[in-house]
């Protein structure tokens, strides 16, 4: 039990104008709506009923209004609701007064319903409900129309409002758990009956709740209006003992009342990343549900519904678990398990580990960020996901009330009445048993549940673990046969040399640079493997990616083989756990010889060279036969089916079936047959060598893969004379044959983890069958058979086409038997005669010549080269619909009206040299465009306009540049805020015209980045506030953006520090990006940028460059359409980038909806880049992408070259506008009617590409407007900060460098306090110039981002508590947080500030008398801090500064930490096991200088906070010093603070 001490410019287009975005989309929820929110609950520990608790719940809900959002009318809330104990006092009196019926509470229930609006429909629905209740032996006591005040609704919510009724019933037979189940069964029967009858209003019928215990009031209202709308909630007779509340932020603005939360049991803040897989596995599982209470499954199923939200489906599955005898906490442990493997907190809780192990064998996790609050009336509680990606703070009061919410301070409580404060950590749970009146902590409730059944015994009896055996020690095939098979399966020499060999040597995926400038597989003239038609999806905004390297403790690639038929009872089925899905040939032999019956299906089909249709029919028929064979094997008891193409290809008349097609087809077929859960699929294939290939096979249903030909290739390569010579000469590591095979497999495993993690998925078992891809280039018949549920928007290959491409690949192996080397098709690197590359040498030379000679005729030659290229992008299949009404060229807007729409891509100074970076900035400023700083900060010297340029174009301020002019500006108009926050200071932010939040990058979405130490020169280190030579890691996610409401908070932060700038958000094109963009617009961004998959990069895994993201044409079209549909298009500017090179590209982008246009690679080429493609090596031969001084001196570019390119581009655009008959770009934005399919473009592979989604429009009604300005009524300022900055005494102190102290009240709705003040000071004095002192004392609970961007001269002292993001990007000053003096609890043990504090801080001090949440000091650059406890991942990615922790710490300390020093007090002797030692080392405090620094920081902590614990430490210093650990990254290992010998050497000198 928890210990509680008593005292201690666009075209407006109608919604109907667009066809469905996805032609193949049975799963609309997955792509068209996502949500986030603020949640919480309040409960009386003694289960006492009262109306005060209801009023408290409404107050708490109202204080989280900023976590929700509204529709485009800015008045209709996305949803708010409250689930609470049924106020039986009210309903008993109502029944007696109006129905003359005395309710028996133990047998009665109340259902809350949304009904259709028409009175006739209402009556029909009521009749059905009554009829079924009566058929099931219920007495219908009566209907009650719920009173409401519709005037509080916004226009859209009112338009879609249902009729709201309650029905009160009483069972004649049932009570208790039996009543619960029968209410569930009756509700499902009613829902199904209405669906079966297919009434036009069926979608408007909805049960909010139907229970003996709980009732739900919800709607499309703001949280501040819920009680005003539902007058019942203010009724004093509405006495309750608990309430769950929820405020929704949806990425869709069309009101849908049923999607408001809480659901019937859960209030969910998060996103299920594996939803499609979870739904399909649940569909497969339903046919084999086995439990005594489920003898009427047919009346209950289907349990899940693809048209429902992730929250609604999760709620339905939890509900099912409840009705087969499990509790809410148990169901959530089953479905959303914590990270139990290698968890030091659980090492003494073996039975709990056994529970998780047992469940993992039968139930995949519903994986993703989630804070879930829940109640079924028996318990109320909350559970957090395994990564802790949502905040959850709680407190207990003296009058025995428990409050938990997404924020602290949701109720204004007297501090003296609070007995306990805490938070949920990753994977943790808190539960109040209402019947037992028992509050249970995380381990209490979980150990109690784990002890209910003998899970350890069940595991011992029924589970085996496959112990991986050694690899083969010799080859199994002659070299010529290997060569033949490699050719048949589609290997090229690049696959061997760049991928397989690299992985075998290094044990990691190969890294490459720039983007993918080759044709899409479906457009290519070369044969491709089927995997190339699949693009990986990734997380952006609505959920974060994970760092699979530094946070591996939450990830697992283990999975299970065998039958998984029953999730509800003890099962005698044997299962086999495998620790990796990558199997060697020996592993496969062990599996075949295991207790699990295993059979093999050979996956080949008969080839007919003379008839594509016959080939297609042969392929289709063979797959159908395999499916039927598999079903027969399952019915005969087979538990594992191996799909194998390991056969000898003796003739051309036989071809393998692409393994992805086989596994996908079987997976889908077996689900539909209801037997999928009875068998595991293993793929034994020669066509699998890249991490992307493995991900596809697993994502479509395979449990494991044996890549026999890839392993054989590794063996032959190792045994080759060339490899042996290289090893003997020391030119490559001296590795054994076993080691290279192991390296290859480990690199695949690491690559898989990265693919999972960039979608925010932690567990391979959740990824298997989850289909987290988008298809580019497969037709409906192929998708429906093998990949149902995966979106394929442009159609593509039929079975005949696919069969022919496969046969072409396979037959090539027979025609090239005498060759000594595989073909090199140039899929990665350009080569003459190979695959076409847009960035080819001929193009680069043509552009260089044109811009250097300033010759438009030469530019036209460059343009013609690109116009005559083979089809490469989707836009190549489109053409302009020229009309006869052209306009004279002189009437078209001038060049500089067009160039002001141009931007360069976000390329960092660090990835680029100073010369290249500054040249681009000057050029863009000259033409009125906007350059983008990229990540990494910017030299403040660049913020001043040049005035010292001589007649030769040189400036002493920038002696390394040429071709300068007086009046030039080197300041990037767009300054980027990326996940590393390098160089983000107040001064940097206030010198921007736009601030760009980079969520994703086209070439590596969801992956973050890394600047190698060799590129961190002294100059780069100065800008990024770190030491030279230190590797700098940018995390995959922004650690202050785990959800859409988090993004809204960051946008709000930026608007505070720089109120004059617009905020842009950079996204990468993928299915569903339109949904995300709607959320981004609602979050307050004025600009949304959509990047294509072919964008450039300084360094990225090769598989990401080739296989992640989709073309910008699809993303831009989707975003524009959905913004129009949601009435938000006028509020944002749309920008697009990714492979734009010509005016034709720009005009096509405009027609698809873009207002502005970004250029990266082509701008660099104009500036001198020769596409050497060695950016990742720091060896660029022309000084563009290097920090080596001698190479930078070779940089050939001058600003005029870049200016010339953009002038030529604008002139080309003017000519096209003239031909189209328009005078401005604004007039054609979104004009899909000006696009046609280009029938002149002939494709090699198929005639089935469908581009109609881009130009099929049902009406031509347009209303032309100028470029939107991003204006909104949405509040963009902190009222408290506004009042502070408009206070005359503060303004006087700022202007005159005076000292001033003020005292101010604060609440959780006061967000970003201090940011506006910091921005004002930075604008006036830069980061360091203010010489006065502002001391602001706040009292209460601070909202998010307290002290963000704090600056020198400002002290923020908070007496109370703070929420997340304290001190974000602070550059100076002090932040002090202490509890009120009247608190009764031990302050050092309590949570006083939230998650992700000191994120990206570059200076200043933070002192906190209490503990922080997760990720304290993440990416801290140079701030100093002392506090008394931290959660998981403290000091992650830290590059400088000092952190002192005087209390308990979570796991994974110092992951990715490359600089700075941290000190941890280890009172429990368990800290070493919590430190991530991949980079840092841990030692005691060994030097006098370190002791001195540590004691000085603790003394200052005492001075600032009065900490009793710190006082005790100082009093007993000689004892406590021996309990401190010092964490030391390599960059600090040779300093006098960390190295005794260095210290003595310094002293000696």
Swiss-Prot record:
Q: Which cofactor does it need?
A: [3Fe-4S] cluster; FAD; FMN
Residues in the active site?
37 (for gatase activity)
Q: What is its EC number?
A: 1.4.7.1
Q: Which reaction does it catalyse?
A: 2 oxidized [2Fe-2S]-[ferredoxin] + 2 L-glutamate = L-glutamine + 2 reduced [2Fe-2S]-[ferredoxin] + 2-oxoglutarate + 2 H(+)
Q: Family assignment? A: Belongs to the glutamate synthase family.
Instruction: Give its localization.
Output: Plastid, Chloroplast stroma
Instruction: Please list the residues that bind FMN.
Output: 1116-1173
Q: What interactions and quaternary structure are annotated?
A: Monomer.
Q: Specify the superkingdom.
A: Eukaryota
Taxonomic source organism:
Cyanidium caldarium
Q: What GO molecular function terms would the record report?
A: 3 iron, 4 sulfur cluster binding; glutamate synthase (ferredoxin) activity; metal ion binding
Has keyword Plastid? Answer: yes
Q: This protein is called what?
A: Ferredoxin-dependent glutamate synthase
The free-text note explaining how the cofactor binds reads: Binds 1 [3Fe-4S] cluster.
In terms of PROSITE patterns, this protein maps to: GATASE_TYPE_2
Q: InterPro entries, alphabetically?
A: Aldolase_TIM, ET-N_metabolism_enzyme, GATase_2_dom, Glu_synth_asu_C, Glu_synth_asu_C_sf, Glu_synth_centr_N, Glu_synthdom, Ntn_hydrolases_N
Q: Which NCBIfam families match?
A: PRK11750.1 (NF008730)
Task: Outline the extent of the Glutamine amidotransferase type-2 domain.
Answer: 37-435
Q: Name one GO cellular component term.
A: chloroplast stroma
Q: Which UniProt keywords apply?
A: 3Fe-4S, Amino-acid biosynthesis, Chloroplast, FAD, Flavoprotein, FMN, Glutamate biosynthesis, Glutamine amidotransferase, Iron, Iron-sulfur, Metal-binding, Oxidoreductase, Plastid
An annotated GO BP: ammonia assimilation cycle
Principal place of residence: plastid
Q: Which SUPFAM superfamilies match?
A: Alpha subunit of glutamate synthase, C-terminal domain (SSF69336), FMN-linked oxidoreductases (SSF51395), N-terminal nucleophile aminohydrolases (Ntn hydrolases) (SSF56235)
Binding positions ([3Fe-4S] cluster): 1169, 1175, 1180
Q: In what pathway does it function?
A: Amino-acid biosynthesis; L-glutamate biosynthesis via GLT pathway; L-glutamate from 2-oxoglutarate and L-glutamine (ferredoxin route): step 1/1; Energy metabolism; nitrogen metabolism
């Amino acid at each position: 039990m928890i210990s509680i001490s008593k005292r201690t410019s666009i075209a407006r287009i109608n919604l109907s104008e667009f066809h469905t975005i996805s032609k193949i989309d049975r799963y609309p929820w997955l792509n068209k709506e996502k949500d986030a929110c603020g949640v919480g609950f309040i409960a009386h520990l003694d289960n006492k009923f009262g109306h005060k608790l209801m009023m408290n719940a409404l107050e708490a809900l109202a204080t989280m209004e900023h976590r929700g959002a509204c529709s485009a009318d800015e008045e209709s809330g996305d949803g708010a609701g409250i689930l609470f104990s049924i106020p039986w006092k009210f309903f008993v009196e109502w029944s007696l007064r109006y129905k003359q019926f005395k309710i028996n509470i133990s047998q009665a229930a109340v259902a809350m319903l949304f009904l259709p609006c028409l009175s006739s429909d209402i009556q029909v629905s009521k009749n059905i409900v009554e009829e079924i209740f009566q058929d099931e032996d219920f007495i219908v006591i009566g209907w009650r129309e719920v009173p409401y005040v519709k005037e509080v609704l916004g226009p859209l919510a009112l338009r879609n409002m249902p009729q709201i009724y309650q029905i009160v019933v009483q069972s004649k037979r049932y009570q208790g758990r039996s009543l619960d189940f029968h209410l569930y069964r009756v509700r499902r029967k009613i829902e199904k009956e209405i669906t079966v009858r297919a009434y036009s209003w069926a979608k408007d019928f909805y049960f909010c709740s139907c229970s003996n215990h709980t009732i739900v009031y919800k709607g499309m209202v703001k949280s501040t209006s819920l009680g005003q709308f539902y007058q019942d909630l203010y009724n004093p007779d509405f006495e309750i003992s608990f309430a769950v509340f929820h405020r929704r932020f949806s990425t869709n603005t069309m009101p849908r009342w049923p999607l408001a939360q809480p659901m019937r049991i859960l209030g969910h803040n998060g996103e299920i990343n594996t939803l499609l897989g979870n739904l399909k596995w649940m569909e497969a599982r339903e046919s084999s549900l086995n439990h005594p209470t489920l003898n009427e499954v047919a009346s209950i199923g289907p349990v899940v519904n693809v048209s429902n939200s992730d929250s609604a489906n999760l709620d339905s599955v939890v509900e099912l678990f409840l009705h087969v005898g499990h509790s809410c906490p148990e169901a959530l442990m089953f479905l959303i398990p914590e990270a139990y493997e290698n968890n030091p907190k659980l090492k003494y809780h073996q039975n709990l580990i056994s529970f998780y192990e047992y469940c993992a064998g039968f139930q995949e996790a519903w994986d993703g960020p989630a804070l879930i609050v829940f109640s079924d009336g028996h318990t109320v509680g909350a559970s957090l996901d395994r990564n802790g990606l949502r905040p959850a703070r709680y407190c207990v009061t003296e009058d025995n009330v428990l409050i938990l919410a997404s924020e602290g301070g949701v109720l204004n409580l007297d501090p003296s009445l609070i007995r306990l404060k805490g938070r949920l950590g990753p994977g943790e749970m808190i539960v109040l048993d209402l019947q037992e009146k028992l509050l249970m902590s995380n381990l209490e409730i979980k150990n109690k549940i784990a002890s209910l059944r003998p899970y350890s015994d069940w595991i011992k009896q029924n589970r085996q673990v496959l112990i991986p055996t050694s690899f083969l020690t010799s080859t199994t095939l002659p070299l010529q046969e290997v060569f033949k098979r490699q050719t048949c399966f589609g290997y090229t020499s690049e696959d061997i040399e760049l991928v397989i060999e690299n992985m075998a040597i290094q044990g990691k995926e190969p890294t490459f640079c720039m983007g993918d400038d080759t044709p899409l597989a479906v457009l290519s003239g070369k044969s491709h493997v089927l995997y190339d038609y699949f693009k990986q999806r990734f997380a952006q905004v609505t959920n974060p990616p994970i760092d699979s390297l530094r946070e591996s403790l939450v990830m697992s690639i283990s999975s299970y083989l065998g039958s998984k038929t029953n999730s509800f009872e003890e099962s005698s089925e044997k299962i086999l756990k495998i620790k990796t899905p990558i199997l060697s040939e020996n592993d496969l032999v062990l599996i075949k010889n295991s207790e699990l019956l295993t059979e093999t299906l050979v996956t080949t089909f008969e080839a007919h060279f003379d008839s594509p249709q016959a080939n297609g029919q042969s392929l289709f028929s063979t797959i159908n036969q395999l499916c039927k064979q598999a079903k027969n094997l399952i019915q005969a008891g087979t538990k594992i089916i191996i799909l194998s193409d390991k056969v000898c290809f003796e003739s051309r008349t036989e071809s393998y079936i692409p393994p992805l097609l086989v596994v996908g087809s079987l997976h889908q077929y077996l689900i539909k047959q209801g037997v999928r859960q009875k068998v595991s699929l293993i793929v034994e294939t020669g066509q699998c060598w890249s991490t992307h290939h493995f991900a596809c096979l697993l994502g479509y249903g395979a449990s494991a893969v044996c890549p026999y030909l890839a392993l054989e290739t590794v063996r032959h390569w190792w045994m080759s004379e060339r490899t042996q010579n290289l090893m003997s000469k020391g030119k490559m590591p001296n590795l054994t044959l076993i080691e290279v095979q192991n390296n290859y497999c480990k690199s695949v495993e690491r690559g898989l983890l990265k693919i999972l993690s960039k979608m925010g998925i932690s567990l391979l078992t959740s990824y298997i069958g989850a289909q987290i891809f988008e298809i580019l280039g497969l037709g409906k018949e192929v998708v429906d058979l093998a990949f149902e549920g995966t979106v394929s928007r442009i159609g593509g290959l039929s079975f005949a086409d696919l069969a022919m491409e496969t046969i072409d690949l396979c037959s090539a192996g027979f025609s090239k038997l005498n060759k000594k080397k595989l073909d090199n098709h140039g899929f990665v690197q350009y080569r003459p005669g190979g695959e076409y590359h847009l960035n080819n040498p001929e193009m680069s030379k043509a552009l260089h010549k044109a811009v250097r000679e300033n010759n438009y005729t030469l530019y036209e030659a460059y343009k013609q080269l690109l116009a005559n290229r083979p089809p490469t992008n989707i836009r190549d299949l489109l053409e302009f619909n020229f009309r006869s009404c052209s306009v004279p060229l002189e009437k078209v807007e001038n060049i500089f009206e067009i160039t002001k729409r141009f931007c360069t891509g976000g390329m960092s100074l660090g990835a680029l040299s100073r010369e290249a970076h500054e040249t681009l900035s000057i050029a863009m400023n000259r033409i009125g465009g906007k350059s983008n700083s990229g990540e990494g900060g910017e030299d403040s010297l660049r913020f001043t306009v040049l005035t010292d340029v001589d007649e030769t174009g040189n400036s002493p301020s920038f002696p390394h540049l040429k071709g300068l002019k007086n009046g030039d500006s080197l300041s990037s108009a767009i300054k980027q805020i990326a996940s590393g926050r390098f160089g983000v200071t107040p001064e940097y932010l206030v010198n921007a015209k736009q601030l760009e939040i980079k969520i994703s990058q086209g070439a590596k979405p969801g992956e973050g980045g890394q600047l190698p130490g060799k590129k961190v020169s002294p100059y780069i280190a100065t800008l990024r506030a770190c030491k030279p030579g230190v590797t700098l890691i940018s995390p995959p996610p922004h650690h202050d953006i785990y959800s859409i409401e988090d993004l809204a908070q960051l946008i709000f932060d930026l608007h505070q520090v720089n109120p004059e700038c617009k905020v842009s958000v950079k996204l990468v094109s993928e299915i569903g990006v339109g949904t995300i963009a709607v959320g981004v617009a609602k979050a307050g961004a004025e600009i949304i940028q959509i990047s294509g998959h072919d964008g450039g990069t300084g360094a990225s895994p090769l598989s990401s460059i080739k296989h992640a993201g989709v073309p910008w044409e699809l993303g831009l079209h989707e975003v524009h359409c959905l913004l129009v549909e949601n009435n938000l298009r006028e509020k944002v500017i749309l920008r697009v980038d990714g492979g734009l090179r010509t005016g034709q590209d720009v005009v096509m982008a405009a027609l698809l909806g873009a207002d502005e246009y970004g250029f990266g690679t082509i701008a660099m080429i104009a500036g001198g880049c020769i596409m050497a493609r060695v950016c990742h090596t720091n060896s660029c031969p022309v000084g563009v992408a290097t920090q080596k001084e001698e190479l930078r001196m070779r940089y050939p570019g001058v600003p005029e070259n870049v200016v010339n390119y953009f002038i030529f581009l604008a002139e080309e655009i003017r000519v096209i506008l003239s031909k189209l008959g328009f005078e401005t770009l604004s007039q054609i934005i979104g004009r899909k009617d000006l696009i046609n399919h280009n029938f002149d473009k002939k494709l090699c592979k198929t005639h089935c590409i469908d581009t109609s989604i881009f130009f099929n429009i049902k009406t031509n009604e347009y209303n032309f407007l100028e470029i939107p300005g991003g204006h909104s009524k949405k509040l963009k300022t902190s009222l408290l900060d506004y009042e502070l900055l408009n206070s005359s005494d503060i303004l006087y102190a700022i202007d005159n460098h005076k000292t001033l102290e003020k005292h101010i009240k604060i609440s959780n709705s006061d967000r970003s306090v201090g940011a506006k003040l910091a921005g004002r000071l930075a604008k006036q004095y830069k980061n360091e110039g203010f010489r006065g002192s502002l001391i602001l004392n706040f009292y209460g609970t601070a909202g998010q981002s307290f002290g963000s961007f704090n600056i020198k001269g400002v002290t923020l002292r908070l007496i109370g508590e703070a929420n997340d993001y304290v001190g974000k990007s602070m550059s100076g000053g002090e932040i002090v947080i202490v509890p009120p003096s009247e608190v009764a609890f031990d302050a050092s043990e309590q949570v006083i500030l939230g998650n992700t504090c000191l994120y990206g801080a570059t200076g200043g001090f933070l002192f906190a008398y209490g503990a922080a949440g997760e990720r304290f000091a993440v990416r801290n650059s140079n701030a100093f801090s002392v506090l008394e406890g931290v959660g998981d991942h403290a000091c992650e990615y830290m590059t400088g500064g000092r952190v002192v922790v005087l209390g308990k710490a979570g796991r994974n300390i110092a992951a990715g930490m490359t600089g700075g020093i941290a000190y941890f007090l280890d009172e429990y002797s368990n800290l070493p096991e919590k430190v991530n030692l991949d980079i840092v080392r841990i030692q005691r405090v060994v030097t006098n200088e370190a002791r001195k620094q540590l004691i000085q920081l603790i003394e200052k902590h005492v001075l600032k906070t009065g900490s009793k614990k710190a006082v005790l430490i100082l009093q007993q210093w000689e004892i406590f010093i021996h309990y401190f650990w010092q964490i030391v990254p390599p960059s600090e290992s040779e300093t006098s603070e960390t190295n005794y010998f260095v210290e003595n050497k310094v002293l000696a000198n």
